[in-house]
Design a protein with these regions (language model features):
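Extracytosolic ligand-binding ectodomains
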Residues: 1-239
């Protein structure tokens, strides 16, 4: 959806040769074609090579309005972007969640202006509080940091509610502390939440990612559209 909304009509895709990369590349390709976007090439890259000129050459020959980079910053993604910029093959990049991080913009700066991607996240009250809380404590609130924080918090709250630290107790109580009803607990308020839960009061943990679970225990998720402007990542919209 984001690629289509940006007016891009053709893309080449490169993906890291792992289950993550293969699966996401297949899903992206199918979604792109369904929206009328031409996929000019789809090629894998290994995550531990010293030279990616061959991969960049194939992608450059195929062409496209943008290059979709599905992978990780430290496993070939940066090098493929560098090669694409150096050869003039591409100047707009569509980034998977594993490619979104401050190290990318620290390396390339405004050369990536106009590039974009998506990652799990929210623009809700909890997410904004977590971002401020993390930055105040010297933590980069990048991809999956909020989810990791919330997972640890939910385990501790479930232990408090159930009065035990065994896995069965956590499993039996985690839905209650995540979905409520009860006192809302946001990022940075874990101490308050633990005190309430351990004292027998009901809590509704929202945390950093506005946590809620379905009846079968799957997390409701939201995604952030991220753009690069002025050499920095910006939050464009919640999807």
């Amino acid at each position: 959806d984001i690629t289509s909304d940006r007016g891009i009509s053709s893309v080449a895709i490169t993906y890291v040769n792992t289950d993550y990369g293969v699966g996401l590349a297949d899903v992206y390709e199918a979604a792109a074609i369904a929206r009328g976007i031409e996929v000019t090439a789809k090629t894998a890259h290994e995550g531990d090579k010293a030279d990616y000129s061959a991969e960049v050459g194939v992608l450059s020959s195929a062409g496209g309005d943008a290059l979709v980079v599905i992978g990780y910053l430290d496993q070939g993604g940066n090098q493929i972007i560098q090669g694409s910029l150096d050869t003039g093959a591409f100047d707009t990049f569509v980034l998977s969640d594993g490619m979104i991080g401050e190290s990318l913009t620290d390396t390339f700066g405004s050369d990536l202006d106009g590039s974009f991607g998506s990652m799990p996240g929210s623009l809700g009250a909890g997410a904004m509080k977590f971002k401020a809380y993390a930055e105040a404590n010297g933590v980069d609130p990048s991809v999956y940091v909020g989810e990791s924080y919330d997972a640890a918090a939910l385990i501790m709250l479930a232990m408090c509610k159930g009065g035990s630290d065994d896995s069965a107790t956590v499993a039996a109580n985690v839905m209650d502390v995540a979905n409520g009803p009860g006192t809302k607990i946001y990022a940075g308020e874990l101490k308050k939440g633990l005190e309430l839960a351990c004292a027998g009061f009901a809590v509704d943990y929202d945390g950093a990612t506005d946590v809620n679970f379905t009846e079968v225990g799957e997390a409701f998720g939201a995604f952030l559209e991220k753009g690069i402007e002025g050499g920095k990542f910006t939050d464009v919209a919640q999807r």
